[in-house]
């Protein structure tokens, strides 16, 4: 007697979100990238179509970041020039996206003006042809000014702008609507707040296919299991037809992995941990691969060797296991 293999088919799928815009679409990108569209749990090709592979955005900053030497070494020749830094990420390290973090805008730091921030975004747009993710410094008032100006200056480029949070989502949502960009909806590892924020943004008439969820992750050893659980619930909600949980997910892997002491502490202090030149790279790569299994669509990363390892893993995971 033939054995019937049961498959758990879903009645819905993750929303597709298009990043970037070509010249014909009103932008200047060489191509667009589509994320989302999954009709099954992560890489369950046997249960539904996984139409778009996860992508990696490499981080570029508008100031010299306070990173450990092992992380700065691949970029020492370009770290003072965001445009050249972005070019190196794309041309040498194969970044799918550029993740431009405007930390220089921080009033407690370099306090770059709005005009300086806009100039940096334009510099990076001119330097590379891939789509951009642009986020502010984290200061609510300054980000309000900076991101509105960036949205206007890059109108038509279909950027992914962030971060919109429950207490300050209105101005960025309005800017994304007017200037035709996508938005990152960030919530603090709380699925109820995540869903509510998506509802609030959508009620302002920004389409669901212009929203990407940042659930706030923890790095390896620092809450990643809770992040994994929240992301699983988001994916299950999407597959069960919950439109307000159906957006693609973005994860700040590099930031969370490299802030862990275990990633960058010198071997002289912790000889049993192994060389920091290898340890930090593995910390970032393993954080990323774990989050892929939870349903990440966009990984924001830092070290090129970690990026290479994760790209190889994505290649393997995208080979169909359908039967």
From Swiss-Prot:
The signal peptide, as residue positions, is none
- Gene Ontology molecular function: cobalamin binding
Q: Which UniProt keywords apply?
A: Carbon dioxide fixation, Cobalamin, Cobalt
| Record's keyword annotation contains Transcription | no
Q: Does the keyword ATP-binding apply?
A: no
Task: List residues binding 5-methoxybenzimidazolylcob(I)amide.
Answer: 188
In its UniProt record, which GO terms are filed under biological process? Answer: carbon fixation; one-carbon metabolic process
* InterPro entries named in the record: Ac-CoA_synth_d_su_TIM-brl (IPR016041), ACDS_complex_subunit (IPR051069), CO_DH/Ac-CoA_synth_dsu (IPR004486), Dihydropteroate_synth-like_sf (IPR011005)
The function of this protein is: Acts as a methyl group carrier in the anaerobic acetyl-CoA pathway (Wood-Ljungdahl pathway) of carbon monoxide and carbon dioxide fixation.
Q: What is its quaternary makeup?
A: Heterohexamer composed of 2 subunits of AcsC, 2 subunits of AcsD and 2 subunits of AcsE.
Name the chain's protein: Corrinoid/iron-sulfur protein small subunit
Q: State the organism of origin.
A: Moorella thermoacetica (Clostridium thermoaceticum)
List the top taxonomic levels of the source: Bacteria, Bacillati, Bacillota, Clostridia, Moorellales
């Amino acid at each position: 007697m033939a054995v019937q293999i049961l498959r758990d088919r879903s009645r819905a799928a993750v929303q597709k979100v298009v990043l970037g815009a070509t010249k014909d679409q009103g932008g200047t990108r060489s191509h667009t990238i589509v994320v989302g569209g999954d009709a099954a749990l992560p890489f369950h090709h046997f249960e539904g179509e996984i139409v778009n592979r996860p992508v990696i955005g490499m981080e570029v900053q508008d100031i010299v970041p306070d990173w450990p030497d092992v992380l700065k070494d691949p970029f020492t020749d370009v770290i003072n020039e965001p445009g050249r830094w972005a070019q190196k990420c794309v041309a040498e390290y194969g970044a799918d996206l550029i993740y431009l973090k405007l930390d220089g805008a921080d009033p407690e730091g370099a306090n770059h003006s709005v005009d300086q921030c806009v100039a940096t975004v334009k510099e990076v747009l001119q330097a590379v042809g891939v789509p951009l993710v642009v986020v502010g410094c984290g200061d609510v008032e300054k980000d309000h000014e900076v991101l509105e100006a960036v949205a206007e200056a890059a109108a038509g480029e279909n950027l992914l702008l962030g971060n919109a949070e429950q207490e300050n989502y209105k101005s960025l949502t309005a800017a994304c609507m007017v200037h035709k960009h996508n938005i990152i909806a960030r919530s603090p590892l709380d699925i109820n707040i995540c869903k509510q924020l998506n509802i609030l943004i959508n009620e302002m008439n920004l389409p669901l296919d212009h929203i990407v969820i940042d659930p706030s992750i923890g790095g390896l050893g620092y809450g990643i299991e809770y992040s994994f659980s929240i992301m699983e619930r988001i994916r299950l909600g999407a597959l069960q037809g919950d439109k307000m949980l159906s957006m693609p997910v973005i994860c700040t892997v590099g930031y969370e992995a490299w802030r862990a002491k275990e990633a960058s502490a010198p071997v002289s202090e912790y000889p049993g941990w192994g060389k920091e030149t290898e340890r930090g790279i593995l910390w970032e790569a393993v954080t990323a691969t774990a989050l892929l299994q939870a349903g990440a669509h966009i990984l924001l990363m830092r070290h090129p060797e970690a990026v290479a390892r994760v790209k190889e893993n994505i290649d393997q995971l995208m080979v169909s296991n359908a039967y």
